[in-house]
Amino acid sequence: VYKRQVYISHKMDEIKVIADEVTIMRDGQYIGKWDVANMTKEQIIAKMVGRELSNLYPPLENHPSDEVMMKVEDFTSIHPRSFRHCSFEIKKGEILGVAGLVGAQRTELMEGIFGLRAHTSGKVWIKGEEVNIKQPRDAIQKSVALLTEDRRATGILGVLSVADNISIASLDALRKGPIMLDNKKILDLVATNKEKMAIKVPSPKTQIKSLSGGNQQKVLIARWLANNPDVLILDEPTRGIDVGAKYEIYCIIADLAKQGKSIIMISSEMSEIIGMSNRVMVMCDGRITGFIDGKDATQENIMALATQFETAPDAAAANQ
C-alpha cells in the first residue's frame, strides 16, 4: 500500500532530501507545484519570497564609530560552570556577532548583563558611565534591550493583541494621565511599525499568537524599539522563521546599525554570524576565547576559537 505524505517545512535541505514534489504558498496564496529534482534550493527560496535573492544577506552600510557604547569587564556568574571573566565592548553603530557551540553560555552571559541572572563580579559601562544592573528594569532604564531566544516562552504574550505586545515595554511614554493610556498614541505606534517593518497583521487587535513566526519576531523588535534603546541584544533573532522573513529581519538589523544602534547578535547559524557581523566574539565553555573582524571571519577560524576548551585537571595530570 502506497501512501502520500504532506511534509510542511521551510528548511530547504529537508525538502530536497525528503520530498518528490514541492508546493509553495506565499501570503496565503497558492504559488505553484514543482518537481524537487528540477529545482535548486535558490529557486525554491525565490518562489517563496517572490523575488530573486542575489545574496542571502543585505550589504552592511553601517560605519561603527570610535565611541564605545557599552563596555563589560570581568563579568562572572555566581554559578561556577557558567560565564566567567568575560570582558568586551561594542561601539556605536556596530553589529557584534556572538558565536559558540551549545553550552558556550552566550545566552547566559547576555541575560546576566540584562539583569536576568545573578553575577558575583564584573562591571558594565554604558556611554562611559558605570551602571549597576540588578534587574531588567535597570537595563531598560539604561537604554539596553534584550530580544530573548525563545519568543513563544519568554517573548510574545500570546493571548494579547499585537497592539498590547508592541506597547507593553513603553507604557510610561504612552500614558495621557497617571493611570489612563493614550489609545491614539498606541495605535500610531503600531501603524508606524507595521509600515516600517512590513508587519503583516489584519488589525492591531489581532492576537499575536495567530501571526507567523517572522511577524511575531518583528512585533517583538518593535516592542523594544519603542523605548529607543542604544544597545539591542538579539538572541537567535531568526530562529524558526522562513527564509523570506529572515532576509527582512536582516534588513531591519542592518538599518538599525546604520542609524547608530549597537547590536549584539547571538546566533547558532555560522553563515548568519559571518554575513551579518562587523566583528565576531566567540565563546567556549563560559569564556570569551577571541574576536575576529567581520571581513576575516570564516567557519574555520570561528570553530577554532569555539572549541578552545580548558583542559580538565584530571586530563592534565594524566598527560604529565
Each predicted region: which residue ranges?
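Glycine-rich phosphate-binding loops of nucleotide-dependent enzymes
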Residues: 3-320
